[in-house]
């Protein structure tokens, strides 16, 4: 079973909060495409609160969101979808790991530490084991809002395509901080560029167009998306568009996630509060517009992911404890809900392929 199967069964992994419940937090989901049905077939995990997952090859990596330390773990994926923990990397001076990113070269694993406002790093061995020792990078400063931006809060990480530049999105200081990473995986002490966004925006996640030098940054607090054109070598980011997202009557909606379709023809974003999945159209030059939106299939769409072939989209609705699966029209990017599955306190969902 895999996410690449045509009309048969596909597999997904969902992670979330366990909050001292004692249960494992990573669920394996079987999605029957033909019947339009999904079910949880097992749960695994070796630490609480695996709130973000990333897959690379035959391994699944998890950010375990803990108040007392930073923690990332590695799991080997078996043929039946079961997970075997290969080890974990704990950083006592970091806290609140909410995002994990494997290096494309397979040698390092990076974590965004929300509570400590830092970027963590550990070495990654071929068998999936993690080795601590690479230094983390800690941000300084604060933002406009006392309730959410009293300190740095690194929320996500990404490699700028075609480079060894690591981009850290910091909600607390309204910035995207870009570091050079060497061949060993070590992060340079000082950033090579800091991209500031409007005060109070609260940036959360960034996505890259699959072909064009375009990036989309979703701002949680401003509830909008900023589209950037990236200069040569992955630097000199320049805002070219600002896209509004659906608000609530009280104006308290929080944007959550953003991703381009695999073919680059659509840009998707999710919004909590209004509980919408938003679709923008992207032209051949990278201009974004033509917004439409649909219900997320639940409440609190914290995260979503598109299947590698672009045929399906899965949404993790944290506030309603479910994953909603959508079929996607390849022609216009429109999505249609086809299945639901209950996953308690789900925060992230990824496809197994």
Model-derived features: where do they sit?
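Beta-rich, blade/repeat-based domains predominating
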Residues: 2-4, 47-57, 92-104, 140-163, ...
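Short loop/turn segments immediately following the C-termini of beta-strands
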Residues: 17-19, 65-67, 114, 124, ...
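Short loop/turn segments immediately following beta-strands, especially the blade-tip
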Residues: 29-36, 75-82, 121-131, 179-187, ...
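A short beta-strand motif characteristic of beta-propeller blades
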Residues: 39-45, 85-91, 135, 141-147, ...
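Blade-loop segments of beta-propeller domains
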Residues: 40-106
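Asp-box/WD-like beta-propeller blade repeats and closely related beta-sheet repeat scaffolds
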Residues: 83-156
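Blade-level signature of beta-propeller repeat domains, shared across WD40, Kelch, NHL, RCC1
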Residues: 318-324, 336-353
